[in-house]
Structure formats: C-alpha cells, structure tokens
A protein has these predicted regions:
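Aromatic-anchored transmembrane helix interface
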Residues: 9-15, 31-56, 67-77, 127-128
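Hydrophobic transmembrane alpha-helices and their immediate junctions
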Residues: 74, 180-184, 282, 302-340
Length: 380
C-alpha cells in the first residue's frame, strides 16, 4: 500500500505531462522544437525504478544490503581506475608526479565523450565518487573481518583522492558535509578506542594528501579559488559569464525572468529547447550553456508547481519515513545531503548518467530505512 502511494506520485506527474502535451501541441504558439524524450525518462526511471525497489521487499536484508553497498563502491573504484589509466597510462608509475598534476589540471578528464560507448560527464562521476567514498568509510565500521576493513580503508582513501582530482566544489563540499554527519554518528555510537582511531585517521589523512598530491592540488585549487573570487565580483557588477558561480547565478536569474511562462503549469515537452533559447538571447554570456544546472528549477520549468513538488517530495519522503518510524539512519542522512547539494549545481536528475541511480537510492532510502537502521546497529 505504501509502495503504491509512492509510485502514484510519479504516475500522477506522468499523466499530467501527457495531458499538458495534448493541450500545448494544440494551442502553443512557440516555435521551439518539442522534446518527447521526457516520456521515456519518466516511464523508465521515475515509475519503473520505484516499482523495482518495492519488489525487493521480501528479499532485502541487512546482509544483502551490505553486499550491494560494497559492490557499488568496488564498481565505482574500478571504473575510476580505468579512467585514470585511460588518461595517463603507465605514466602513473613511471612519472607519478607529472601524472597526478595532469589529472588535477584536466579535472580527471572532465566530460568524457564517446567513453566506453557512451558519455561520462564529470558531475555524475563526482557524485558517484562522493557517495561511494562515504559508503566505504561507513562499511569499515560494519565489517568485522580485519582484511576487509583494511581493503575498505584503502578504497576510501583512493576514492577520496579521485574526488580531489575532479576539483568540483559542489562535490567536495557535499562530501565534507556527509563526512561530518557520518563522524557525528560514529562519535555518538562508538567506544573511546574507535573515537581515537577516527581522530588519528583524520589527522593523518591531511599530511598524506599534502605529501603525494600537494603540487597538483595547490596549483589547480588556487586557480579555482581565484576564479570564484573573480566571478563573485563579476556577479556584483551584473556580469554572469564564467565557469563556476557566475553562470549558475545567471541561470537562476534568467529562469526567474521567465517565471511567468512556466511558474504554474510548466513548459513540458518544450522546456528543453525553450531554456536554450532563453540562454542564447540573454545577453549575459550564457549562450554557451544548454540548461539551468539545477534539478529543482529544471523540473519546475518542465512541470510547473507539480514538477517542483515532485522533486521536493523525492528528497523529503525519506526523512518523513525515518521520523515517522523513529528509525533514523545516519548513512541515509549523509548520502541524501550529498545528492541534494549536487543537484543544486547540476541537473543530475535529468542526466542519463545519474538519474537512474539517484532514483534507485532515494527509493531504497524511503522503503528500507529500517534495513539501513538495523545495519547500523550491527544486524548482519
């Protein structure tokens, strides 16, 4: 019954977009090209993924969840190791310093087009690295096998290193917030010995990064810091061209300029190309971009009030469920913060690289918060 109500939210939105399309195709005066791919996205991801998650009700146990989380981390680690070797090859061993500097300078390859038969964008890749780094850290305290603990510790360090290669402010900020939540929980629940180990580990982590990657990190991060300061000043002067904060402020500003077009009913199938036209004609240097870089605004433009309500529901439903059942999972809280922060700087819920996995995780957070809760209390 609960699963039916959850799926009904997305089914209602799908029907709304369908009716909206029938209405707008008859009465719309816009010359923009319609994009019908939203029906595929809604049906395959927003409806079928929650149905799949509900179907796991009889099988998902803390033990199976642990294996899923471990394999998720291992898969992300292997993918990024492949990416690194694809970028620098054996230079990682023959000239490690230059290879690391190259990875920082190129932000782990940036957006990788035609990669393994598809496209791998930097923001979704960063999201997965941040999520799996936190999960690997969490699993260190769940597994009892010392060998697995060491392996997970190495996995956590590597994933954290890979995250730093991306030089993605939102991803790093999201990771830091999630990491803080995880350590708050661990300090509350752990013994003095474990607390001491956590503190020692955190203290040692900074020097390790300083020794091995400081040169590359320093140069690229100084460049990004200067870029942020410069763009903040540009925004104050009404200049929105740039590659970090300025265009995102410009996207929000441009969206609210046209809020009368989408604020209530949304633009539906015309949203994609309509937004492109806004940016092209903005005069604020936004013409090189193609979207608003914010999932909440994206679905507000697409579905109006109902679209915005659907996205807010996605993030609020797991918290509502946890407080209602009084089974609060701190891992869920940490991962939700990561997903929320990054969706405010990129349309991750609209990209094929990330939409499916985000909806899968959000569905699991809602339906199986009790399984996460039991796992955190040692029930395996």
């Amino acid at each position: 019954q609960t699963g039916g109500k959850y799926v009904l939210v997305f089914g209602t939105y799908f029907i709304y977009i369908l009716l909206q399309t029938l209405f707008t195709t008859r009465s719309c005066t816009w010359a923009d090209k319609p994009y019908y791919g939203i029906f595929e996205d809604l049906l395959l991801d927003f409806i079928l993924i929650p149905i799949y998650v509900v179907s796991l009700k009889e099988w998902l146990t803390p033990r199976l969840l642990t294996r899923f989380l471990f394999l998720f981390c291992a898969g992300c680690l292997l993918l990024n190791i492949y990416v690194i070797f694809d970028l620098v090859g054996i230079g990682l061993f023959t000239d490690t310093s230059s290879a690391i500097n190259f990875l920082y300078a190129n932000r782990l390859g940036g957006n990788k087009l035609d990669f393994l038969g598809g496209n791998l964008y930097l923001e979704p890749q960063t999201l997965y690295i941040a999520l799996t780094a936190l999960i690997a850290y969490f699993l260190i305290f769940i597994y009892r096998n010392k060998g697995l603990k060491v392996f997970l510790g190495v996995m956590f360090l590597l994933l954290t290193l890979f995250l730093s290669f991306t030089v993605t402010k939102a991803g790093i900020l999201a990771f830091i917030l999630g990491f803080g939540i995880m350590n708050f929980y661990l300090f509350m629940r752990s013994s003095f010995r474990v607390r001491s180990a956590i503190l020692v580990g955190i203290v040692l982590l900074v020097p390790v990064f300083g020794i091995f990657v400081f040169d590359g990190l320093k140069g690229k991060y100084e460049e990004r810091t200067e870029e942020i300061v410069r763009e903040v000043e540009n925004v104050k002067q009404g200049i929105y061209a740039g590659g970090t904060i300025a265009p995102r402020v410009g996207f929000i500003r441009e969206s609210f300029i046209h809020v009368d077009e989408f604020g209530v009913w949304g633009l539906g199938i015309y949203a994609k190309h309509r937004v492109n036209n806004w940016l092209q004609s903005s005069g604020d240097g936004l013409g090189v971009f193609t979207n608003v870089h914010n999932s909440f605004i994206h679905y507000w433009i697409q579905g109006g009030i109902l679209g915005l309500a659907m996205i807010v529901f996605l993030f609020c439903a797991p918290f509502y469920r946890m407080f209602r059942t009084r089974r609060i999972s701190w891992l869920i809280c940490a991962l939700l913060v990561v997903i929320f922060v990054m969706n405010n700087t990129c349309i991750l819920l609209a990209l094929n690289n990330s939409r499916l996995m985000i909806l899968l995780l959000l569905g699991m957070f809602y339906f199986y918060n009790d399984v996460f809760w039991r796992l955190e209390r040692g029930d395996r």
